[in-house]
């Protein structure tokens, strides 16, 4: 479930592994990652697709931890190697021949998908929480485009779940394997 959520949100591993319930708004379907856990040290709002909300509701129902959304079996933030080990154990192929997929590689997949499907560069870059390197541009472009990104993230979720138009390009990871994580 943690891996599927990571893929659906195009988030970094550390952001998802340390995710807490107080960051989640299930009514407005937004996850706000605090600045201290973000690479760019700025809070990041993530619009949540219907499938991402389903995962969170399932986690809440399990009530494995009062604070952490995806706790380890010991009740702490999972190790940074947990997703890497899972992908290796499942032998999930990378787009690079002979290599195993990485958690971070799903962010690249999202970026490619967004470009190939005609989404504005700004939407994809904001979804990935990338900063604008041009200082002048950054000064004038302060919005996170949250509402504009909602449709893109819902379309990404349909693609990831195999309901998109381009299903022949979807690499299958069994739902059982995803749930085991």
Where are these regions (language model features)?
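Residue-level marker of regulatory loop/turn positions in helix-turn-helix DNA-binding domains and
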Residues: 5, 103, 145
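The alpha-helix within a helix-turn-helix
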Residues: 6, 17, 125
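Conserved tyrosine-mediated DNA breakage-rejoining catalytic core shared by Y-recombinases
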Residues: 9, 14-61, 131-138
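Short, basic (Lys/Arg/His-rich) helix/loop patches that form interaction surfaces
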Residues: 9, 46, 54-74, 81-126, ...
